[in-house]
Amino acid sequence: MAAITASMVAELRAKTDAPMMECKKALTEADGDLDKAEELLRVKLGNKASKAASRVTAEGVVASFIDGTTGVLVELNCETDFVSKNDDFLAFSAKVAELIAKQNPADVAALSALEIDGVSVEATRTALIGKIGENLTIRRFARYANGGKLVSYLHGTRIGVMVEFDGDEAAAKDVAMHVAAMKPVSLSAEQVPADLIAKERSIAEQKAAESGKPAEIVAKMVEGSVQKYLKEVSLFNQPFVKNDKQTVEQMLKAANTTVKGFTLFVVGEGIEKKQDDFAAEVAAQVAAAQKG
């Protein structure tokens, strides 16, 4: 059997980014053949990725990248908060954000086929799953390239905002922070998605119906509730978070600044997290032990 040297392990690790012990095992199994060991590792890491694929990824990071008038906000997910702070995962997130800005993929599938340092995004992601041991996914991204000015704001790594604007950068930055805090769903009341309005109207109708008041009064109550909701969730109508005596629209007018659009990503938003039942888990383990 060929001797496995430290330099061989280091070379294989450089090629695959796999853990040292995995590299040594692969080299031993391949009897020192680097190419064969690399192939074995690719298969093994791929198997790890396949096993991890069904696991829920509700943690993660939001990364941003701005180069002139091109900007990107991207959300990548992992399984635990611990891994969301992993240096390799954070570096991958930053590279993905920059790649989106430069290559303009149509969607996540198209992005996965692009290359980072000569290796496809998908292969890089798969290798990282093998190295870290958790499922990792690229969930969504937004890309701006309309010629407008851009600012981004990251609250830690869990909330990210990008704002497209004309005018004062400091005012736009304040808007980005406001969006992170108040989470509007649109610029104006007119732009609130119809499905959200319908949902709010349904809730208002149910509440108003319980009042027992005449139909015309109920109708006015419902309309009042809907209009209140529209003001609460539209950016321009919200009280400015740094001075609630004025709306965001009034603040922007005073700063001679126009906001053309924004994107808000909150890590894991809308993803149902797995709730572990510790007692049930222990009971299952005890039952399994008794069967054995």
UniProtKB/Swiss-Prot annotation:
Localisation per UniProt entry: Cytoplasm
Leader sequence segment: none
Species for this entry: Cupriavidus necator (strain ATCC 17699 / DSM 428 / KCTC 22496 / NCIMB 10442 / H16 / Stanier 337)
Involved in Mg(2+) ion dislocation from EF-Tu: region residues: 80-83
Main localization category: cytoplasm
Family of the protein in this entry: Belongs to the EF-Ts family.
Keywords, alphabetical: Cytoplasm, Elongation factor, Protein biosynthesis
Keyword field contains Zinc: no
The protein's name in its UniProt record: Elongation factor Ts
Cellular component per GO, a single term: cytoplasm
Function (record text): Associates with the EF-Tu.GDP complex and induces the exchange of GDP to GTP. It remains bound to the aminoacyl-tRNA.EF-Tu.GTP complex up to the GTP hydrolysis stage on the ribosome.
GO molecular function: translation elongation factor activity
Xref: PANTHER family: ELONGATION FACTOR TS (PTHR11741), ELONGATION FACTOR TS, MITOCHONDRIAL (PTHR11741:SF0)
